[in-house]
Amino acid sequence: MIVIENILGQDVLTEVAAALRELRWEDGRNTAGATARRVKRNQQADLSSRTGSKVREVLLEAVKRHPVVEAYARPLKFAPPLISCSGEGDAYGLHIDNPVMGKGDARLRTDLSFTLFLSPPESYDGGELEIETVFKTESVKLPAGSMVIYPSTELHRVTPVTSGERFVFVGWIQSAIKDAAQRAILFDVTNLKAGLARRFPPGSPELLTLAKTESNLIRMWSDI
């Protein structure tokens, strides 16, 4: 799991907040799997309108182009993302995301899930994203514009919202590196390369060797 801060700037957040008020909303259970449908209680934005499509494009592009998302997730495909709103009394009980999403050529395996927070945490009470890891339950409630990426293999829930409204942008990633341990190794290598680039000149033997190692690991492990 990783938290990435400031995916969105304040100008974008303000524009998105205004656009969300123009969208049509429907029962969030319409897109839930059979198990999750029983415990899901929220509203989901209809993104088929021009405004909805624009908001989705802006948010998804911000996620895709962030260098930490690329280094950590190694995205191959993104499932169609959602925007959800949880008002007073809404919650999403403990569930697991669908292992496969989409149809036909658009089908993908869900390796990683992400939640990009669109509401300031002080604007609502409750609404924590709780992720059940092997060792403990991680509780996540981030500033607007920040996001969390976590394994789709983990059970998770959204606690009841007791006041205010919680808006989030939610999506799923199929990674080019299927194995989570291999992704973690590559993330370490990428961070090491960035650190050494501040100490060694471009084209140095150290950086070239590390770049070769990173490339060959990707070549060996990529599931493409």
UniProtKB/Swiss-Prot annotation:
Fe cation binds at H95, D97, H156. SUPFAM superfamilies: Clavaminate synthase-like (SSF51197). Residues 77-175 form the Fe2OG dioxygenase domain. Keywords: Dioxygenase, Iron, Metal-binding, Oxidoreductase, Vitamin C. Its EC number is 1.14.11.-. One of its GO terms (molecular function) is L-ascorbic acid binding. It comes from Hyphomonas neptunium (strain ATCC 15444). This is PKHD-type hydroxylase HNE_1625. 2-oxoglutarate binds at R166. It is an enzyme of class 1 (oxidoreductase). Its cofactor is Fe(2+); L-ascorbate. Binds 1 Fe(2+) ion per subunit. InterPro entries: Oxoglu/Fe-dep_dioxygenase_dom (IPR005123), PKHD_hydroxylase (IPR023550), Pro_4_hyd_alph (IPR006620), Pro_4_hyd_alph_FE2OG_OXY (IPR044862). Pfam families: 2OG-FeII_Oxy_3. GO terms for biological process: DNA damage response; intracellular iron ion homeostasis.
